[in-house]
């Protein structure tokens, strides 16, 4: 297996979907849809959040959007539930939480209203240090970060500058190709 570097697989930041803090979730979805249409159906499922100066400040992922559209997720502590179950998320825990918190019972009209009202600044993810990876690192290191639970996608840097995004699916594709070549 030939070692690939992160910079060989990442999506350059200038080619990634960008939104601003003041945009609504509806705006995010529209921006993602426009990107998909302009790129022959190839879709990004998350967006980079940039400040007024155009510099990276965070990201909005599918999980961030789902949690914003269903506010009852804010009432539970997933880590606490998993730890209480000895590190496992069982069918019983999932069913119990689903019933106890009435997840996804709001009509789509309510979800539409939430999507229009929620701002990116309210739901965006501000990455921790463990979610950044340098361009010159190996794909294996990126895979290691993902397996240990890094919030997707990883943010790629060169020095102090954010230069790209590394999606889990793109890392998987590198490994898949290597396995097929065996």
Segments predicted by a language model, with ranges:
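A glycine-centered beta-loop-beta connector
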Residues: 32, 41-63, 146-149, 154-169
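Short N-terminal micro-motifs specific to bacterial/archaeal maturation
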Residues: 16-19, 56, 114, 130-133, ...
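Short, surface-exposed, polar/charged, turn-prone segments marking secondary-structure boundaries
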Residues: 37, 46-48, 75-78, 86-88, ...
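Residue-level detector of functional hotspots within protein domains
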Residues: 3-5, 33-35, 51, 106-109, ...
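The conserved cystathionine-beta-synthase
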Residues: 19-43, 69-72, 132-150, 157, ...
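Tandem CBS (Bateman) regulatory domains
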Residues: 1-15, 62-131, 143, 147, ...
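DNA-contacting interfaces and partner/effector-binding or oligomerization modules
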Residues: 6-17, 21, 30, 41, ...
């Amino acid at each position: 297996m030939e070692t690939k570097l992160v910079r060989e697989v990442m999506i350059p930041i200038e080619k990634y979907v960008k939104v601003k803090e003041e945009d609504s979730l509806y705006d995010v979805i529209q921006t993602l849809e426009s990107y998909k249409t302009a790129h022959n159906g190839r879709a990004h499922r998350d967006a980079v959040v940039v400040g007024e100066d155009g510099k990276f400040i965070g990201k909005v992922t599918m999980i961030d959007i789902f949690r914003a559209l269903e506010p009852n997720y804010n009432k539970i502590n997933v880590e606490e539930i998993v730890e209480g179950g000895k590190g496992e998320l069982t069918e019983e825990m999932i069913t119990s939480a689903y019933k106890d918190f009435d997840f996804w019972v709001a009509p789509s009209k309510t979800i539409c209203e939430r999507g229009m009202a929620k701002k990116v600044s309210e739901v965006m993810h501000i990455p921790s240090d463990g979610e950044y990876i340098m361009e010159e690192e190996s794909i294996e290191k990126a895979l290691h970060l993902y397996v240990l639970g890094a919030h997707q996608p990883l943010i790629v840097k060169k020095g102090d500058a954010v230069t790209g995004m590394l999606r889990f699916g793109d890392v998987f594709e590198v490994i898949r190709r290597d396995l097929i070549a065996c």
